[in-house]
Amino acid sequence: MVWSVDMDDFSGTICGSGVKYPLIGAIREELRGTPRDTVAPGIEPSDIDWETVARSPPALAPEPDVQAERISIQDLLQQTKGASKKPLPALLTPSLPDNLRKPRVFCYFTNWSYKRPGMGQFSPEDIDSNLCTHIVFAFGTIKDNKLAASDDNDVGDAFNDGTYGRIMKHKEVNPDVKVLLAVGGWAFGSKPFRALTENVFRMNGFVYEAIEFLRLHNFDGLDIDWEYPRGADDRASFVSLIKELRLAFEGEHKSSKNPKLLLTAAVPASFEAIASGYDVPELAKYLDYINVMTYDFHGQWEDTVGHNSPLFPLNSASTFQKKLTVDYAAKEWVRQGAPMEKLIIGMPVYGRTFTLADQTKFDIGAAADGGGQAGKYTGEEGFLSYYEICDFLHEDNTTLVWDNEQQVPFAYRGEQWVGFDDERSLRTKVSWVKTEGFGGIMVWSVDLDDFRGYCGTGKYPLLKALTKELEGYMVELKYEGPYETPRGDGSDPVEEKKLCDNDIGQVTFHRDTQDCKMYYVCQGTVEHHKTCPTGLVFNENENVCDWPSAVEECGHLVAT
């Protein structure tokens, strides 16, 4: 509707264009596909009565132009004023192709983190679920060949939610976040998995009991952390376990109509461990995601100083040492047959420490005399959380070094030495992830980031640096496996809930719960994935692109 025609240049003499009704004519030109300059020879545009043209039947509409147009924030805000307050789809970006998806951000946190003293104590409520696509609780356990909680407090009772219930409340904040339970881990070891898989009946019982346990506690999937299968028997057993879990998850999904449970695995970065225990092409068939633990390349178990998670090797490194890097490890999984879009690259938010044998020799490869002093809150020799590293860096006489070859920092003071990741190194790693085309990142573990803002740069500085660097990145989907879907999320495309289901052609708007800057426009049953202009987020209440401060769920994007 136009308010009002008497305010347009109805005579064609005021604005100097010689055209009657230039604004109404522009509206009709955009809506009905009749250009104003398409006139018969010898007829001037000023001779056309655009009021009559505007009332004429519409021309056949051409195919819509999906080319995005750049508009300024001021233009957008001006356009959104008025009665409808709905953004104009023609001004926005085209829909997301089916062969692309957003990167995954797996956020692990541990069940021993809440036992840390003082400001190190971490609770499920401390998680910022808007920074994660998947939350992984580590760890569950195996008791009597069944998946079980590792702590009675995890399950809760009639009087309290327990840890599981408290984690699930994040789905109320971010309905699209997936919550998985991890089982295994370094302390759990390999023996329980061997005992489970050496008997087919025992393994199948575990598989079906696991489904019941996950559904009972509202988990969205299971993360298998077998550290580590070694040898031909373990190699075959691990594939059997993953295959049986996947087949059971698929069958339960089809019979119950519930969303399919996700199946992931945490796997080593060591090329030796990969060769010894992992049939990569077979595992890739059944796993939704493969979380590569690209850290702990060096630590207190060695007698020389080395960095926890170097991206690249030193030029002077030996052939063996050059394989102990993030770059080599991730590409080794690809060489062995893992699809790049399924590989999730580990990002540590902690450091490994050493005690120098000689304070004057502090570079990579210097002699070490065991691990560094235990942290005040984590209490483990040879290990510091990022918020403990902040304390270390602020002590007098501490020297911070950026290793330009390995693309990571380290610091030393006296005989104490720490190699860690900071915002700069993590941004560099994510840039590398994007260049190579991997499927996303996983963080070990969010309870080790500065979740309280103790370091003075806000809460979760490392996790925020990671997610900020991922913005705009899309993962290309190339793998064609037996259980793949166009979106690569492991769900059944036939029974997947459809966002756009209005068969009368109504236009509706919906926020993208995983990305504040994006939203969906439904034209009947046709879905278009759109992006707001730079600096704005989608406001579902008003159906406009708005300032982040006006949208509660997106307040964390407000510039500081």
Question: What are the language-model segments listed below?
Answer:
Residues 3-6, 112, 140-143, 186-187, ...:
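Acidic glycine-/aspartate-rich tracts in secreted/extracellular proteins
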Residues 200-222, 275-283:
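An active-site-proximal structural segment forming one wall of the substrate-binding cleft
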Residues 10-16, 22-27, 87, 91-101, ...:
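Glycan-binding loop/region signatures in secreted carbohydrate-active enzymes
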Residues 3-10, 14, 19-21, 27, ...:
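Substrate-binding surface in catalytic domains of secreted glycosidases
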Residues 2-30, 76, 85-214, 244, ...:
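Glycan-recognition patch characteristic of GH18 chitinases/ENGases
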Residues 31-94, 483-493:
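Extracellular mucin-like PTS segments
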Residues 27-31, 475, 487-560:
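Cysteine-rich, disulfide-bonded extracellular modules and peptides in secreted proteins
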Residues 135, 181, 224, 245, ...:
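Conserved, mostly hydrophobic/aromatic
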